């Protein structure tokens, strides 16, 4: 492609809301242009990257035995009402009605239409398994769209849905899709981790997120430095301490005056306590109005997902109000503890492991020291209720856990019969009986992975794309293209030769100043830069620059061809 035949719309102006590097660079490089809040035009260079990602996704999905189809983007309300999601989706669902006053919505996801199609066309186990996918624009009316295409209202997604007769068949396809997502991200060239994830309201036994590693990631993921264990922070666990090895303390409980101390940090600072010897006692109320005291070590944080999954607690829970706490303890938050606690205690394993712990005295401005489990507190339950921290022992006993930020670009999970059952998507099984099909669902954020790639690899000058998705592999940057016949001749011939070799190449024939060409090339992120000028041509050389390594070489065109091919 010649630069004069496409639209290179680089700019130095940035809106204030462009906080993330990916958002800034996509705007500055002219890859996208904002049309409305959370809605963007894909400019020629941006669309080219997007299409390369789509091609990789499509190629790997086809290799995995999935078949592509295209579902409508506008969905009738009746379908979502069958699964009760017409109301459950809330304001994120963009609703509209036609001239006949029939209700529709812009598809945020496509479980209902795919099941509707399947129930009309799949009647027997002999037609299964079947894996269908599409690459399509979705719309979710985010209350606060931000971070560019990372969290836009309109986005492009690959969503696949598989259909099965039994759980083993579903698990087989699930494992195939797990491997396929790894292949996609490997082929793109991103550093990532598949992590065990919470299934949430969807349910099922299996769920994995595919997280691209990046400092700007909203998700926190943990992984072992000694094994392949990895999980989202919501689900991550740790090796439990051996509580049988606790020694009996001979120290007696002591009540100490701690005026105006309401936080663990202040307690440790003013009283010189080790924070790992302290506990935090937080009061929650479950959905049936039952109160519980949740106890964790002073330097740990509660994990909401784990708490909502406890058998003792009817989800969802809420934090008790200050008034509710005072009515139970006759003390305020910041002074609560486990000794003579009037409500059920659920303590984390790490809190249980503490000997001679420090806790609130259930009396304002007082704390206890040298409190011990089983000796002083006997009525309690133990559970994993905290977030893991760096240095925890991996649950498989191999290595310790480390935390990093990630950007979720893919999510796969087993739907089972969550949608097929209420929508009566039944088949005749091998036993001759009618039963709901089991389903798997596999989402991949095509437009989001583009932003994730930028977050993972960039410098102060612009984007450093993985070569597989760079808008152009090679940019020919001729100096004085419109003034020097020799430069033009060499540049044009090289351009044609590279095209003939199947290389994706851009010839910058705009006649722009060298500084502008070089800055644009760095900003946009072409993988290989070839500078052609009269000075070097006199020596039979051109200048080659690798965008990723920044290495520059003065080489012959023959040597250049060897590098590029």
Curated annotation (Swiss-Prot):
GO molecular function, one term: proline-tRNA ligase activity
Enzyme's top EC category: ligase
Protein source organism: Francisella tularensis subsp. novicida (strain U112)
Function: Catalyzes the attachment of proline to tRNA(Pro) in a two-step reaction: proline is first activated by ATP to form Pro-AMP and then transferred to the acceptor end of tRNA(Pro). As ProRS can inadvertently accommodate and process non-cognate amino acids such as alanine and cysteine, to avoid such errors it has two additional distinct editing activities against alanine. One activity is designated as 'pretransfer' editing and involves the tRNA(Pro)-independent hydrolysis of activated Ala-AMP.
Places the protein is found: Cytoplasm
Recorded domain comment: Consists of three domains: the N-terminal catalytic domain, the editing domain and the C-terminal anticodon-binding domain.
Protein name: Proline--tRNA ligase
Gene (name only): proS
Major location category of this protein: cytoplasm
A Pfam family recorded for this sequence: HGTP_anticodon
Organism superkingdom: Bacteria
Quaternary structure and partners: Homodimer.
Keywords noted in UniProt: Aminoacyl-tRNA synthetase, ATP-binding, Cytoplasm, Ligase, Nucleotide-binding, Protein biosynthesis
């Amino acid at each position: 492609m010649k630069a004069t035949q496409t639209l290179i719309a680089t700019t130095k102006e940035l809106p204030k809301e462009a906080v993330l590097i990916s958002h800034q660079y996509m705007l500055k490089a002219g890859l996208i242009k904002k049309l409305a809040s959370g809605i963007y035009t894909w400019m020629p260079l941006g669309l080219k990257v997007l299409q390369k990602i789509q091609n990789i996704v499509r190629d790997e999905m086809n290799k995995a035995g999935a078949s592509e189809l295209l579902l409508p983007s506008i969905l009738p309300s009746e379908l979502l009402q069958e699964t009760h999601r017409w109301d459950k989706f809330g304001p994120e669902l963009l609703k509209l009605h036609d001239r006949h006053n029939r209700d529709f919505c812009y598809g945020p996801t496509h479980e209902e239409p795919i099941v509707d199609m399947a129930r009309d066309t799949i009647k027997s186990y002999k037609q299964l398994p079947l894996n269908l996918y599409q690459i399509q624009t979705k719309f979710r009316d985010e209350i606060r769209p931000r971070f560019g295409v990372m969290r836009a209202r309109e986005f492009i997604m690959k969503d696949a849905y598989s259909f099965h007769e039994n759980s083993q068949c579903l698990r087989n396809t699930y494992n195939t899709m797990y491997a396929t997502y790894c292949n996609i991200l490997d082929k793109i060239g991103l550093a990532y981790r598949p992590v065990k994830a919470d299934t949430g309201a969807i349910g099922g036994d299996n769920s994995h997120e595919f997280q691209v590693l990046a400092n700007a990631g909203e998700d926190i993921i943990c992984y072992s430095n000694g094994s392949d264990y990895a999980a989202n922070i919501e689900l991550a666990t740790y090796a439990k301490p051996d509580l049988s090895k606790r020694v009996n303390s001979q120290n007696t409980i002591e009540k100490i005056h701690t005026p105006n101390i309401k936080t663990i940090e202040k307690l440790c600072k003013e009283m010189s306590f080790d924070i790992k010897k302290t506990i935090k006692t937080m009061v929650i109320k479950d959905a049936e109005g039952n109160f519980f005291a949740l106890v964790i070590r002073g330097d740990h944080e509660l994990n909401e997902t784990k708490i909502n999954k406890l058998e003792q607690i009817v989800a969802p829970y809420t934090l008790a109000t200050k008034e509710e706490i005072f009515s139970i303890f006759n003390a305020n938050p910041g002074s609560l503890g486990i000794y003579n606690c009037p409500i059920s205690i659920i303590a984390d394993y790490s809190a249980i492991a503490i000997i001679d712990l420090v806790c609130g005295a259930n009396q304002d401005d007082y704390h206890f020291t040298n409190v011990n489990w089983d000796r002083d507190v006997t009525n309690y339950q133990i559970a994993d209720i905290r977030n893991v921290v760096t240095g925890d022992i991996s649950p498989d006993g191999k290595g310790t856990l480390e935390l990093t930020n990630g950007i979720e670009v893919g999510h796969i999970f087993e739907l089972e019969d969550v949608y097929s059952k209420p929508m009566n998507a039944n088949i005749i099984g091998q036993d001759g009986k009618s039963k709901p099909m089991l389903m798997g669902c596999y989402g991949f954020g095509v437009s989001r992975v583009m932003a994730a790639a930028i977050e993972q690899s960039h410098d102060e000058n612009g984007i450093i794309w993985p070569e597989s998705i760079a808008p152009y592999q090679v940019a020919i940057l001729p100096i004085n293209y419109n003034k020097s016949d020799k430069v033009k001749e060499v540049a044009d011939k090289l351009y044609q030769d590279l095209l003939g070799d199947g290389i994706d190449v851009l010839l910058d024939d705009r006649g722009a100043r060298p500084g502008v060409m070089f800055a644009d090339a760095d900003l946009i992120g072409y993988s290989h830069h070839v500078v052609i000028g009269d000075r070097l041509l006199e020596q039979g050389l051109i200048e080659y620059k690798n965008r990723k390594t920044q290495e520059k070489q003065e080489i012959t065109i023959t040597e250049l061809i060897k590098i590029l091919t």
